[in-house]
Amino acid sequence: RDVLGSRGLGDVYKRQMHTVEITLEQVLLARDRRVLRQRELAARYGGTLLSFTMNIAGPVKDAPLVRLALHAGLASLDRDLGQPLHRELIQAPTGPEALLVYDRPAPWVKERCLLLEEREAVGRLYDLDVLSPEGEKLSRPQSRRCLICGGPVTVCSRSRAHGLAAIRARTRDILADFAAGHLSALARQALEDEVDLTPKPGLVDRRNTGAHDDMDRPLFHRSAGALAPYFRQFAALGMAGASPRELQSLGRQAEHAMLDATGGVNTHKGALYSFALLLSALGRCLAEGGDPFDTAAVIAAALPPAENTHGSAVRSQCGGVRQEAVSGFPTARHMRGILESAGPLSALVWAMSRLDDSTLVYRGGPQGLAYVRRRAAELLRLPEETLPLALESLDDDLMARRLSPGGSADLLALALFLRAAAPEAWL
Protein backbone atom coordinates (compact mmCIF):
# COMPACT_ATOMS: atom_id res chain seq x y z
CA ARG A 1 0.00 0.00 0.00
CA ASP A 2 1.24 3.50 -0.88
CA VAL A 3 1.30 5.41 2.41
CA LEU A 4 2.13 8.77 0.79
CA GLY A 5 -1.51 9.50 0.02
CA SER A 6 -1.90 12.99 -1.41
CA ARG A 7 1.46 14.16 -0.04
CA GLY A 8 3.39 13.26 -3.22
CA LEU A 9 7.03 13.94 -4.03
CA GLY A 10 6.69 16.81 -6.47
CA ASP A 11 7.96 19.50 -4.08
CA VAL A 12 11.21 17.89 -2.95
CA TYR A 13 13.32 20.49 -4.77
CA LYS A 14 11.59 23.24 -2.83
CA ARG A 15 13.00 21.90 0.45
CA GLN A 16 16.56 21.36 -0.78
CA MET A 17 19.08 23.38 1.18
CA HIS A 18 22.00 23.88 -1.18
CA THR A 19 20.47 24.54 -4.59
CA VAL A 20 21.96 27.37 -6.64
CA GLU A 21 20.29 29.18 -9.52
CA ILE A 22 22.60 29.67 -12.48
CA THR A 23 22.56 31.99 -15.47
CA LEU A 24 22.54 31.33 -19.19
CA GLU A 25 26.07 32.69 -19.34
CA GLN A 26 27.23 30.05 -16.86
CA VAL A 27 25.57 27.32 -18.92
CA LEU A 28 27.31 28.51 -22.09
CA LEU A 29 30.69 28.76 -20.35
CA ALA A 30 30.29 25.21 -19.01
CA ARG A 31 29.46 23.98 -22.51
CA ASP A 32 32.54 25.68 -23.97
CA ARG A 33 34.74 24.20 -21.25
CA ARG A 34 33.28 20.75 -21.90
CA VAL A 35 33.95 20.99 -25.64
CA LEU A 36 37.55 22.03 -24.98
CA ARG A 37 38.05 19.10 -22.63
CA GLN A 38 36.51 16.72 -25.15
CA ARG A 39 39.09 17.80 -27.72
CA GLU A 40 41.91 17.27 -25.23
CA LEU A 41 40.71 13.75 -24.42
CA ALA A 42 40.24 12.91 -28.10
CA ALA A 43 43.82 13.96 -28.81
CA ARG A 44 45.17 11.98 -25.87
CA TYR A 45 43.26 8.70 -26.27
CA GLY A 46 41.95 8.60 -29.83
CA GLY A 47 38.92 6.58 -28.76
CA THR A 48 35.15 7.01 -28.72
CA LEU A 49 34.14 9.83 -26.38
CA LEU A 50 30.95 9.84 -24.30
CA SER A 51 29.76 13.07 -22.71
CA PHE A 52 27.15 12.48 -19.97
CA THR A 53 25.10 15.41 -18.66
CA MET A 54 21.57 15.80 -17.28
CA ASN A 55 18.63 17.47 -19.04
CA ILE A 56 17.31 19.63 -16.21
CA ALA A 57 15.03 22.51 -17.17
CA GLY A 58 15.11 25.76 -15.25
CA PRO A 59 17.76 27.74 -13.37
CA VAL A 60 18.61 25.01 -10.82
CA LYS A 61 20.77 22.38 -12.51
CA ASP A 62 22.45 20.73 -9.53
CA ALA A 63 20.85 18.95 -6.56
CA PRO A 64 21.36 15.64 -4.72
CA LEU A 65 18.58 14.00 -6.73
CA VAL A 66 20.26 15.04 -9.97
CA ARG A 67 23.65 13.75 -8.79
CA LEU A 68 22.14 10.43 -7.70
CA ALA A 69 20.56 9.95 -11.13
CA LEU A 70 23.87 10.60 -12.89
CA HIS A 71 25.76 8.35 -10.45
CA ALA A 72 23.29 5.51 -11.11
CA GLY A 73 23.54 6.14 -14.84
CA LEU A 74 27.31 5.73 -14.68
CA ALA A 75 26.83 2.37 -12.94
CA SER A 76 24.47 1.31 -15.74
CA LEU A 77 27.04 2.36 -18.34
CA ASP A 78 29.66 0.23 -16.61
CA ARG A 79 27.34 -2.78 -16.82
CA ASP A 80 26.33 -2.14 -20.43
CA LEU A 81 29.60 -0.90 -21.94
CA GLY A 82 32.29 -2.20 -19.58
CA GLN A 83 35.01 -0.11 -17.99
CA PRO A 84 36.15 2.94 -19.97
CA LEU A 85 39.75 3.77 -20.82
CA HIS A 86 39.28 7.05 -18.99
CA ARG A 87 36.60 8.57 -16.78
CA GLU A 88 36.37 11.96 -15.16
CA LEU A 89 33.57 13.53 -13.14
CA ILE A 90 32.89 17.24 -12.93
CA GLN A 91 30.75 18.70 -10.16
CA ALA A 92 29.62 22.25 -10.85
CA PRO A 93 26.65 24.54 -10.18
CA THR A 94 25.68 23.99 -13.82
CA GLY A 95 25.11 20.33 -13.00
CA PRO A 96 27.12 17.11 -12.70
CA GLU A 97 28.96 15.89 -15.79
CA ALA A 98 31.01 12.88 -16.79
CA LEU A 99 33.41 12.39 -19.69
CA LEU A 100 34.32 8.83 -20.64
CA VAL A 101 36.57 7.35 -23.33
CA TYR A 102 35.97 3.85 -24.74
CA ASP A 103 38.03 1.58 -26.93
CA ARG A 104 34.84 0.61 -28.76
CA PRO A 105 33.28 1.64 -32.10
CA ALA A 106 31.24 4.81 -31.74
CA PRO A 107 28.04 3.31 -33.30
CA TRP A 108 28.19 0.43 -30.79
CA VAL A 109 28.49 2.88 -27.89
CA LYS A 110 25.68 5.07 -29.25
CA GLU A 111 23.34 2.11 -29.65
CA ARG A 112 23.75 1.14 -26.00
CA CYS A 113 23.37 4.72 -24.85
CA LEU A 114 20.06 4.97 -26.71
CA LEU A 115 18.87 1.80 -24.98
CA LEU A 116 19.80 3.27 -21.60
CA GLU A 117 17.95 6.51 -22.36
CA GLU A 118 14.80 4.56 -23.23
CA ARG A 119 14.97 1.77 -20.64
CA GLU A 120 13.38 3.66 -17.75
CA ALA A 121 11.87 7.06 -17.07
CA VAL A 122 15.01 8.63 -15.62
CA GLY A 123 16.84 7.85 -18.87
CA ARG A 124 14.75 10.56 -20.50
CA LEU A 125 16.73 13.03 -18.38
CA TYR A 126 20.08 11.61 -19.51
CA ASP A 127 21.98 13.48 -22.23
CA LEU A 128 24.47 10.96 -23.64
CA ASP A 129 26.43 12.48 -26.52
CA VAL A 130 28.74 10.10 -28.39
CA LEU A 131 31.63 11.42 -30.50
CA SER A 132 33.69 9.32 -32.89
CA PRO A 133 37.51 9.35 -32.69
CA GLU A 134 37.40 11.89 -35.53
CA GLY A 135 35.21 14.22 -33.44
CA GLU A 136 31.94 13.56 -35.27
CA LYS A 137 28.85 13.62 -33.03
CA LEU A 138 26.56 10.67 -33.70
CA SER A 139 22.93 11.72 -34.09
CA ARG A 140 19.80 9.97 -32.84
CA PRO A 141 17.76 8.08 -35.43
CA GLN A 142 14.62 9.80 -34.15
CA SER A 143 13.72 12.75 -31.93
CA ARG A 144 13.46 12.32 -28.18
CA ARG A 145 10.00 12.22 -26.63
CA CYS A 146 8.51 15.06 -24.61
CA LEU A 147 8.45 14.52 -20.83
CA ILE A 148 4.87 15.77 -20.62
CA CYS A 149 2.96 14.44 -23.62
CA GLY A 150 5.31 11.87 -25.14
CA GLY A 151 5.36 13.59 -28.53
CA PRO A 152 8.50 14.76 -30.37
CA VAL A 153 10.37 17.03 -27.98
CA THR A 154 11.53 19.34 -30.78
CA VAL A 155 7.93 20.19 -31.67
CA CYS A 156 6.89 20.86 -28.08
CA SER A 157 10.04 22.85 -27.40
CA ARG A 158 9.62 25.14 -30.40
CA SER A 159 5.97 25.83 -29.59
CA ARG A 160 6.53 26.00 -25.82
CA ALA A 161 3.52 23.74 -25.53
CA HIS A 162 3.74 22.93 -21.83
CA GLY A 163 5.57 25.69 -20.00
CA LEU A 164 8.59 25.57 -17.73
CA ALA A 165 6.63 24.93 -14.52
CA ALA A 166 5.06 21.73 -15.88
CA ILE A 167 8.39 20.46 -17.20
CA ARG A 168 10.15 21.14 -13.88
CA ALA A 169 7.36 19.42 -11.93
CA ARG A 170 7.55 16.35 -14.17
CA THR A 171 11.35 16.31 -13.83
CA ARG A 172 11.07 16.43 -10.05
CA ASP A 173 8.61 13.54 -10.05
CA ILE A 174 10.86 11.42 -12.29
CA LEU A 175 13.94 12.04 -10.14
CA ALA A 176 12.19 11.39 -6.84
CA ASP A 177 10.47 8.24 -8.09
CA PHE A 178 13.74 6.95 -9.50
CA ALA A 179 15.62 7.63 -6.26
CA ALA A 180 13.13 5.70 -4.14
CA GLY A 181 13.11 2.72 -6.50
CA HIS A 182 16.88 2.72 -6.96
CA LEU A 183 17.64 2.74 -3.23
CA SER A 184 15.02 0.06 -2.61
CA ALA A 185 16.57 -2.22 -5.24
CA LEU A 186 20.03 -1.77 -3.71
CA ALA A 187 18.69 -2.58 -0.24
CA ARG A 188 17.00 -5.75 -1.43
CA GLN A 189 20.14 -6.82 -3.29
CA ALA A 190 22.23 -6.26 -0.17
CA LEU A 191 19.99 -8.56 1.88
CA GLU A 192 20.19 -11.24 -0.80
CA ASP A 193 23.97 -10.90 -1.16
CA GLU A 194 24.39 -11.24 2.61
CA VAL A 195 22.47 -14.50 2.88
CA ASP A 196 24.25 -15.92 -0.20
CA LEU A 197 27.72 -15.16 1.20
CA THR A 198 29.42 -18.42 2.26
CA PRO A 199 30.72 -19.63 4.68
CA LYS A 200 29.21 -17.66 7.56
CA PRO A 201 29.53 -19.12 11.08
CA GLY A 202 26.18 -20.04 12.62
CA LEU A 203 24.27 -18.23 9.86
CA VAL A 204 22.13 -19.28 6.92
CA ASP A 205 24.20 -19.48 3.73
CA ARG A 206 24.81 -21.72 0.72
CA ARG A 207 26.56 -24.27 2.94
CA ASN A 208 23.77 -24.90 5.47
CA THR A 209 21.12 -23.24 7.62
CA GLY A 210 23.54 -22.46 10.44
CA ALA A 211 22.15 -22.55 13.96
CA HIS A 212 18.58 -22.25 12.63
CA ASP A 213 16.03 -25.01 12.13
CA ASP A 214 13.29 -22.75 10.76
CA MET A 215 15.17 -20.79 8.08
CA ASP A 216 16.92 -21.37 4.77
CA ARG A 217 18.17 -19.28 1.84
CA PRO A 218 14.94 -19.37 -0.19
CA LEU A 219 13.05 -18.10 2.86
CA PHE A 220 15.47 -15.18 3.23
CA HIS A 221 15.07 -14.34 -0.46
CA ARG A 222 11.27 -14.35 -0.10
CA SER A 223 11.59 -12.11 2.91
CA ALA A 224 13.79 -9.64 1.03
CA GLY A 225 11.30 -9.56 -1.82
CA ALA A 226 8.42 -8.87 0.57
CA LEU A 227 10.32 -5.97 2.15
CA ALA A 228 11.40 -4.31 -1.11
CA PRO A 229 8.18 -2.31 -1.69
CA TYR A 230 8.39 -0.99 1.85
CA PHE A 231 12.04 -0.03 1.40
CA ARG A 232 10.89 2.11 -1.50
CA GLN A 233 8.26 3.77 0.64
CA PHE A 234 10.73 4.46 3.47
CA ALA A 235 12.91 6.40 1.04
CA ALA A 236 9.84 8.15 -0.38
CA LEU A 237 8.56 9.11 3.07
CA GLY A 238 11.98 10.49 3.92
CA MET A 239 11.92 12.69 0.83
CA ALA A 240 8.40 13.81 1.73
CA GLY A 241 9.47 14.88 5.23
CA ALA A 242 7.53 12.22 7.13
CA SER A 243 7.43 12.17 10.92
CA PRO A 244 8.98 9.38 13.02
CA ARG A 245 5.46 8.20 13.85
CA GLU A 246 4.65 7.76 10.15
CA LEU A 247 7.87 5.82 9.65
CA GLN A 248 7.08 3.61 12.64
CA SER A 249 3.63 2.85 11.23
CA LEU A 250 5.15 1.81 7.91
CA GLY A 251 7.68 -0.30 9.79
CA ARG A 252 4.89 -2.28 11.42
CA GLN A 253 3.30 -2.88 8.01
CA ALA A 254 6.65 -4.04 6.63
CA GLU A 255 7.16 -6.44 9.53
CA HIS A 256 3.71 -7.96 8.97
CA ALA A 257 4.51 -8.39 5.26
CA MET A 258 7.78 -10.12 6.15
CA LEU A 259 6.06 -12.51 8.56
CA ASP A 260 3.32 -13.26 6.03
CA ALA A 261 5.98 -14.13 3.44
CA THR A 262 7.93 -16.38 5.81
CA GLY A 263 5.07 -18.11 7.61
CA GLY A 264 5.78 -16.25 10.83
CA VAL A 265 9.57 -16.68 10.85
CA ASN A 266 11.60 -13.62 11.88
CA THR A 267 14.15 -13.45 9.08
CA HIS A 268 14.92 -9.74 8.86
CA LYS A 269 13.43 -7.85 11.80
CA GLY A 270 16.75 -6.35 12.90
CA ALA A 271 17.76 -5.58 9.33
CA LEU A 272 14.35 -4.02 8.66
CA TYR A 273 14.86 -1.59 11.55
CA SER A 274 18.30 -0.53 10.31
CA PHE A 275 17.36 -0.27 6.65
CA ALA A 276 14.16 1.63 7.44
CA LEU A 277 16.11 4.24 9.37
CA LEU A 278 18.89 4.61 6.82
CA LEU A 279 16.59 4.69 3.78
CA SER A 280 14.39 7.30 5.45
CA ALA A 281 17.46 9.34 6.34
CA LEU A 282 18.83 9.11 2.81
CA GLY A 283 15.48 10.24 1.44
CA ARG A 284 15.38 13.20 3.78
CA CYS A 285 18.93 14.20 2.86
CA LEU A 286 18.10 13.95 -0.83
CA ALA A 287 15.37 16.52 -0.25
CA GLU A 288 16.89 18.71 2.44
CA GLY A 289 20.63 18.09 2.51
CA GLY A 290 22.57 16.97 5.57
CA ASP A 291 24.46 13.91 6.74
CA PRO A 292 22.46 10.66 6.41
CA PHE A 293 24.05 9.02 9.44
CA ASP A 294 23.39 12.00 11.70
CA THR A 295 19.85 12.13 10.33
CA ALA A 296 19.32 8.41 10.95
CA ALA A 297 20.56 8.85 14.52
CA VAL A 298 18.07 11.67 15.13
CA ILE A 299 15.19 9.58 13.75
CA ALA A 300 16.23 6.56 15.83
CA ALA A 301 16.40 8.64 19.01
CA ALA A 302 12.89 9.98 18.33
CA LEU A 303 11.41 6.48 18.07
CA PRO A 304 10.50 4.72 21.33
CA PRO A 305 12.37 1.45 21.95
CA ALA A 306 10.47 -1.66 20.91
CA GLU A 307 9.07 -3.79 23.70
CA ASN A 308 8.45 -7.54 24.02
CA THR A 309 11.14 -8.47 21.48
CA HIS A 310 14.38 -10.43 21.62
CA GLY A 311 16.19 -7.11 21.49
CA SER A 312 14.26 -5.60 24.39
CA ALA A 313 14.85 -8.73 26.45
CA VAL A 314 18.64 -8.28 26.28
CA ARG A 315 18.88 -4.49 25.96
CA SER A 316 20.06 -4.15 29.55
CA GLN A 317 23.00 -6.46 28.78
CA CYS A 318 24.06 -4.88 25.47
CA GLY A 319 23.10 -1.89 23.42
CA GLY A 320 21.88 -3.88 20.43
CA VAL A 321 20.77 -2.50 17.09
CA ARG A 322 19.12 0.59 18.59
CA GLN A 323 22.39 1.73 20.14
CA GLU A 324 24.09 1.24 16.76
CA ALA A 325 21.39 3.36 15.12
CA VAL A 326 21.38 6.26 17.60
CA SER A 327 25.17 6.37 17.23
CA GLY A 328 24.89 6.79 13.45
CA PHE A 329 25.76 3.18 12.47
CA PRO A 330 29.52 3.39 13.19
CA THR A 331 30.01 -0.38 12.93
CA ALA A 332 28.35 -0.65 9.52
CA ARG A 333 30.36 2.31 8.26
CA HIS A 334 33.63 0.75 9.40
CA MET A 335 32.60 -2.56 7.83
CA ARG A 336 32.06 -0.76 4.55
CA GLY A 337 35.71 0.28 4.65
CA ILE A 338 36.75 -3.33 5.26
CA LEU A 339 34.69 -4.38 2.24
CA GLU A 340 36.85 -2.16 0.06
CA SER A 341 40.14 -3.57 1.34
CA ALA A 342 39.52 -7.16 2.42
CA GLY A 343 36.06 -8.35 1.38
CA PRO A 344 32.76 -9.29 3.03
CA LEU A 345 33.93 -12.31 5.03
CA SER A 346 36.61 -10.24 6.74
CA ALA A 347 34.07 -7.51 7.44
CA LEU A 348 31.72 -10.06 9.02
CA VAL A 349 34.44 -11.53 11.23
CA TRP A 350 35.51 -8.06 12.34
CA ALA A 351 31.93 -7.28 13.40
CA MET A 352 31.64 -10.60 15.23
CA SER A 353 34.77 -9.73 17.21
CA ARG A 354 33.45 -6.30 18.29
CA LEU A 355 29.68 -6.11 18.20
CA ASP A 356 27.44 -6.45 21.25
CA ASP A 357 25.21 -8.77 19.26
CA SER A 358 21.78 -9.04 20.91
CA THR A 359 21.00 -12.21 18.93
CA LEU A 360 24.00 -13.93 20.48
CA VAL A 361 23.09 -12.69 23.95
CA TYR A 362 19.53 -13.94 23.54
CA ARG A 363 20.69 -17.37 22.40
CA GLY A 364 23.76 -17.87 24.58
CA GLY A 365 23.80 -15.19 27.23
CA PRO A 366 26.86 -13.03 27.92
CA GLN A 367 29.00 -16.18 27.83
CA GLY A 368 27.89 -16.99 24.29
CA LEU A 369 28.63 -13.45 23.15
CA ALA A 370 32.08 -13.52 24.74
CA TYR A 371 32.86 -16.89 23.16
CA VAL A 372 31.98 -15.76 19.63
CA ARG A 373 33.87 -12.50 20.03
CA ARG A 374 36.98 -14.35 21.21
CA ARG A 375 36.84 -16.89 18.38
CA ALA A 376 36.30 -14.16 15.79
CA ALA A 377 39.25 -12.18 17.15
CA GLU A 378 41.41 -15.29 16.68
CA LEU A 379 40.29 -15.56 13.04
CA LEU A 380 41.29 -11.97 12.36
CA ARG A 381 44.91 -12.91 13.03
CA LEU A 382 44.91 -15.62 10.34
CA PRO A 383 46.18 -15.10 6.78
CA GLU A 384 43.25 -14.12 4.59
CA GLU A 385 43.66 -17.12 2.28
CA THR A 386 43.02 -19.48 5.23
CA LEU A 387 39.90 -17.65 6.40
CA PRO A 388 37.22 -19.64 4.49
CA LEU A 389 38.39 -22.98 5.87
CA ALA A 390 38.61 -21.57 9.39
CA LEU A 391 35.12 -20.13 9.03
CA GLU A 392 33.75 -23.54 8.07
CA SER A 393 35.24 -24.97 11.26
CA LEU A 394 33.74 -22.17 13.35
CA ASP A 395 30.43 -22.67 11.54
CA ASP A 396 30.31 -26.29 12.69
CA ASP A 397 31.19 -25.19 16.23
CA LEU A 398 28.51 -22.50 16.45
CA MET A 399 25.90 -24.80 14.94
CA ALA A 400 26.59 -27.30 17.72
CA ARG A 401 26.31 -24.51 20.32
CA ARG A 402 23.16 -23.05 18.66
CA LEU A 403 24.80 -19.63 18.41
CA SER A 404 24.03 -17.26 15.54
CA PRO A 405 25.63 -13.80 15.14
CA GLY A 406 22.55 -12.38 13.46
CA GLY A 407 23.30 -8.79 14.44
CA SER A 408 26.64 -8.94 12.64
CA ALA A 409 24.93 -10.36 9.56
CA ASP A 410 22.40 -7.52 9.54
CA LEU A 411 25.16 -4.92 9.71
CA LEU A 412 27.05 -6.68 6.92
CA ALA A 413 23.96 -6.28 4.73
CA LEU A 414 23.86 -2.60 5.66
CA ALA A 415 27.55 -2.23 4.78
CA LEU A 416 26.97 -3.94 1.43
CA PHE A 417 24.16 -1.47 0.78
CA LEU A 418 26.37 1.50 1.65
CA ARG A 419 29.07 0.28 -0.72
CA ALA A 420 26.57 -0.04 -3.57
CA ALA A 421 24.71 3.21 -2.86
CA ALA A 422 27.87 5.32 -2.23
CA PRO A 423 25.89 8.25 -0.78
CA GLU A 424 29.02 10.38 -0.47
CA ALA A 425 29.02 10.61 -4.29
CA TRP A 426 25.68 12.41 -4.49
CA LEU A 427 24.93 14.06 -1.15
Enumerate the language-model features and the residues they cover:
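Single conserved hydrophobic/aromatic residue that forms the stacking wall/gate
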Residues: R1-Q16
